[in-house]
Each structure stands twice: as structure tokens, then as C-alpha cells.
Regions:
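Active-site "cap" helix and flanking loop/linker of ATP-utilizing ligase/carboxylase catalytic domains
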Residues: 270-292, 309-378
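Short acidic-hydrophobic, aromatic-tinged amphipathic segments that line or gate anion-handling sites
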Residues: 69-75, 147-151, 182
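ATP-binding N-terminal substructure of ATP-dependent carboxylate-amine bond-forming enzymes
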Residues: 23-120
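Peripheral (often C-terminal) accessory segments that flank ATP-dependent C-N-forming ligase machineries
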Residues: 333-440
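Internal nucleotide-binding/catalytic subdomain
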Residues: 178-315
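Short, Lys/Arg-enriched N-terminal segments with co-localized hydrophobic residues
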Residues: 9-25
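A conserved helix-loop-beta module that forms one wall/lid of the active-site cleft
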Residues: 118-178
Length: 440
């Protein structure tokens, strides 16, 4: 008879207990959203040794490779809350601004659920340009001079008597497309008609701002009340076409860091813009808890605020989070729980990403075009608007993919990403090849 090794029962029981304990300690996370930003968040969470299960609602074809996608839309707040309860979700992370402004964080917290994201009251810093401008005016935070109008005739009279170019901003949420910079009175009149008479973004007000000059940069911070923890800088490319031409979009590419912004401007922005606005929101009874995004401009008079967002930027997140070495679950938990923030550690490698968008974007466009991705090793491909039908990857949004390269230099990151972009096969995508032109 062959000899049989009998595993010692005591040792076996101990190993079972250790495995079971480790499994029980693994966290379940729900990410809300279905774009490239959420793909980058899921990607970062998947690298956490603490996270065992990730759900994403609704997700996309790329996210489905890392998480279980849930067929719930971002504004199905009651259903998302019930899902989190039923599936014993330890932490929910909200990507888009729309559910935040609709109060999803308030609903979850009232139900005793842990969530990363600001209250509806705090989300007004993005959901209402007029609220943000008035807050900055009350607390002496540097920004462009402005006036707010709800009446077309009053707005047109004010604008035509002023200087051009001028900046016109729809007061509410407009998916990053509610800003127009007319260079002539005729362009301004048409834009005001579109916003105030035709209500192209819905009924609302228009903020008229002075036109500032200088390079823009994105400064995102993790904020928990008065605790403001900065991330590395990035720079977005808003215009649709090369040479910074065409209409504004949600963003056609980004890179990180931003060498044209000196450390003294970063320090000024943190001490005189980001920290003061966080303190202002605490003072006014709507403390911020989540990611505060400062869209800033380096003007001849120093950094000034162009806009605030109440969440991770998109496409900035796709070039910032790949550089984060700290366990992002610890970061999200610290903000959600009001506990001490871990020290953030960043990779010295730099990143640059190119957005591939459907032809016609940011206007009308067609969906459902097949996409063939090349063998990918040295770059990250974040899905922004994709779906998988019968095993075929297809376009499903305005912005479809973001290809992010990393390297020791921005030129190296640029070249790696652009090579992959040029090898992606799809009949209905366009991209800007000049991402990073200010620093290359």
C-alpha cells in the first residue's frame, strides 16, 4: 500500500482560518460611471491588495475586464443604494458630476453607506458657475471678473458694450461643452441666443467673464473639509482640433506633469486658491469631501481660477492616477471616513494620453463602429465610450478611447501613445496628434 501523508489537522485548521480571514478582509468597491475616468479609477483600485471585488455601474467594455459591470445608470440612485446594501459594498466611489449634483452622496450617507464624493450642496461648486463665482468673490479668491444674466436683452447689451474676446458660460452642467469664447459681437449674440433663448443646455443663466490669457493647468486635490491634499498637475486640451481650433470638448488629451508651471505657481495655487476655497465651503456650511478640481490659468498676474469641478477630471484622471503609487483604497477611505490622509507617493515617470473620438464630436455623431485594438504592452488604453456586442468591440460614445503612454520624458510618453493610436483600426475615429505641443 502506498504511503499517505496526513496533513496535521491543527495546522490545516490554522491555514483555513488565515485564508478565510484574509478573504473576509478583502474589500468590495462600487464605482459609479462608465467612462475613461472610471476605467482609470477601477484600474487603480484593481492594484490595491485590499480590494477583492469591484463593481462598476454601468461600466463599459474595457472596465468589464477588471470589474463586474452592473446594468444601472448613474442617476438610478435608489437602485444603486439598494445594490450597495444587498452586495455588502464597503465603499462607493462616484466618478461623474451629474449624480453628485443630484445628491447621491447624501442618499448613501443617510443610509449609513461609505461613499467617496461631495454632497449636493458642495457639488454646486461645479453645478452652478454663478455659485462658484459668487463664493470666490466673497472670499477674495483670484478669478476673472464676471456678471451673471438670465435675460437675453440684458446680457446682450452688457456683452456688446464690452471687450472681445469674451467668455460665456452656461451656469449649469453641460458635459464640458457649456463654454463659448466669441471673438466678435455676432458670435456672442448667437451664443447668447443659443443659451438663453433656445435653451440649448436647458433653462438657466449665463455667466459672462473677462477673457484671461495664459496657459491653463488642472490642479486636483483630495479634500476632506479643511484637509487639502494635492495631486500632481496635469494639462488638458479642450479644443476639438489641432492647433487648439474648433469647439470646446470634454477634453481631447492630457499629460502630467506640467513643466511650464513653476513650483512657485503651484504653491500659490494651493495656498491662495485650493485651501481657501475649501475653507470657504466649510465656513458657508457646505464642507467639501471628495476630489476638488481646480481648472486654473497662469496669467501675467499669477494663477487664477477658470473653473472648479467637484470630481476627478476626464481626461486628466487617466494621466494622473497611473502615476499614483499610494494604495488608492487608503486614500478614498481616509476622505470618506474623515481619518488621516496617507502620504501620497508618485512615480517619477511622466504620462501623456490621446483621446480618440467619434467623427462629429462634440456635435452629433454615429455609434456602433467596430474597433480593432493592436497588441498592447507598453501603453494603457482606457475605454471612454465602448460596448461589446457578440464579441466585437464597438464605439458607443463621443469620446471612445484614451491611449496613455508613460516614460522618462514627455516625448517618450508621447511617441509610445501616438504609435498605438495610429495602429488602432476604426473607420469613424479622429484624434489630435499635437497633444503636449506646449512642452514638446
Amino acid at each position: 500500500m502506498d504511503s499517505v501523508y496526513i496533513f496535521p489537522r491543527k495546522k490545516f485548521d490554522q491555514q483555513v482560518r488565515e485564508i478565510t480571514l484574509e478573504h473576509c478582509m478583502m474589500k468590495t468597491v462600487l464605482v459609479i460611471g462608465g467612462g475613461g475616468r472610471e476605467h482609470a479609477i477601477v484600474d487603480a483600485l484593481s492594484r490595491s491588495p485590499q480590494v477583492g471585488k469591484i463593481y462598476c455601474a454601468p461600466g463599459n467594455a474595457g472596465i468589464a475586464e477588471l470589474a463586474e459591470c452592473v446594468p444601472l445608470k448613474e442617476l438610478q440612485i435608489a437602485e444603486l443604494k439598494e445594490f450597495a446594501i444587498a452586495h455588502e459594498v464597503d465603499l462607493t466611489v462616484v466618478g461623474p458630476e451629474v449624480p453628485l449634483s443630484a445628491g447621491i452622496a447624501d442618499e448613501f450617507r443617510t443610509a449609513g453607506l461609505r461613499i467617496f464624493g461631495p454632497s449636493a450642496a458642495a457639488a454646486r461648486i461645479e453645478a452652478s458657475k454663478d455659485f462658484a463665482k459668487a463664493l470666490m468673490a466673497r472670499h477674495n479668491i483670484p478669478t476673472a471678473a464676471y456678471r451673471t444674466f438670465s435675460d437675453f436683452d440684458a446680457a446682450w447689451e452688457y456683452v456688446r458694450a464690452g471687450k472681445f474676446p469674451v467668455v460665456l458660460k452656461y451656469d449649469g452642467l453641460a458635459a464640458g461643452k457649456g463654454v463659448v469664447i466669441p471673438e466678435t459681437p455676432a458670435e456672442a449674440e448667437q451664443a447668447l441666443k443659443d443659451m438663453l433663448l433656445d435653451e440649448c443646455f436647458g433653462k438657466g443663466k449665463v455667466v459672462v467673464e473677462e477673457f484671461l490669457t495664459g496657459p491653463e493647468f488642472s490642479f486636483m486635490c483630495f479634500v476632506d473639509g479643511l484637509v487639502v491634499t494635492p495631486m500632481v498637475l496635469s494639462q488638458d486640451h479642450k479644443r476639438a482640433f489641432e492647433g487648439d481650433k474648433g469647439p470646446n470638448t470634454g477634453g481631447m488629451g492630457a499629460y502630467s506633469p506640467v513643466p511650464i508651471i513653476p513650483q512657485e505657481d503651484i504653491d500659490f495655487a494651493l495656498e491662495h486658491i485650493l485651501k481657501p476655497v475649501a475653507a470657504a465651503m466649510v465656513a458657508e456650511g457646505c464642507p467639501f469631501q471628495g476630489v476638488l478640481y481646480g481648472g486654473l490659468m497662469k496669467t501675467p498676474d499669477g494663477p487664477k481660477v477658470i473653473e472648479f469641478n467637484c470630481r476627478f477630471g476626464d481626461p486628466e484622471t487617466e494621466v494622473v492616477l497611473p502615476r499614483l503609487l499610494t494604495d488608492i483604497y487608503d486614500v478614498f477611505s481616509a476622505v470618506a471616513d474623515g481619518t488621516p490622509m496617507p502620504e501620497l507617493s508618485w512615480s517619477p515617470e511622466v504620462t501623456m494620453g490621446f483621446v480618440m473620438a467619434s467623427k462629429g464630436y462634440p456635435g452629433s455623431y454615429q455609434k456602433g463602429f467596430p474597433i480593432v485594438l493592436p497588441e498592447i504592452a507598453a501603453v494603457r488604453v482606457y475605454h471612454m465610450g465602448t460596448k461589446c456586442e457578440e464579441g466585437v468591440l464597438k464605439t458607443a460614445g463621443g469620446r471612445v478611447l484614451m491611449v496613455v503612454g508613460s516614460g522618462k520624458t514627455l516625448q517618450e510618453a508621447h511617441d509610445l501613445a501616438l504609435e498605438t493610436v495610429r495602429n488602432i483600426q476604426c473607420d469613424n475615429l479622429f484624434y489630435r496628434s499635437d497633444i503636449g505641443w506646449r512642452v514638446l
